[in-house]
């Protein structure tokens, strides 16, 4: 289901194609790889995403387990083998983004992998 515009914070391991896709839909996107945030520690990025009320998108499973509160609005973890190309990751994200009940993302960690996704409440 599609609805509303969101604010995203894309970790540096997320392909530019996904940033372009979200921006073209009108979403507000901070792309770590494209600016001065590149190379900053995960905890700094996490806090920044949380402070700005953004959805944190990453491929780094370790970044999703930070015991820092408050958490970002939601966390989207892109899973799959390291051999997945930017094209494959973009297609995987697009399939998820076109199916998900977007208004239910807040407060969830979403694990997106080839063939589907799972949502889990963020533990506080």
Regions from the language model: what does each represent?
Residues 64-96:
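Mid-chain, well-packed structural core segment of small domains
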Residues 6-55:
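N-terminal first-folded block
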Residues 49-67:
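Acidic, metal-binding active-site segment of PIN/NYN-like and related structure-specific nucleases
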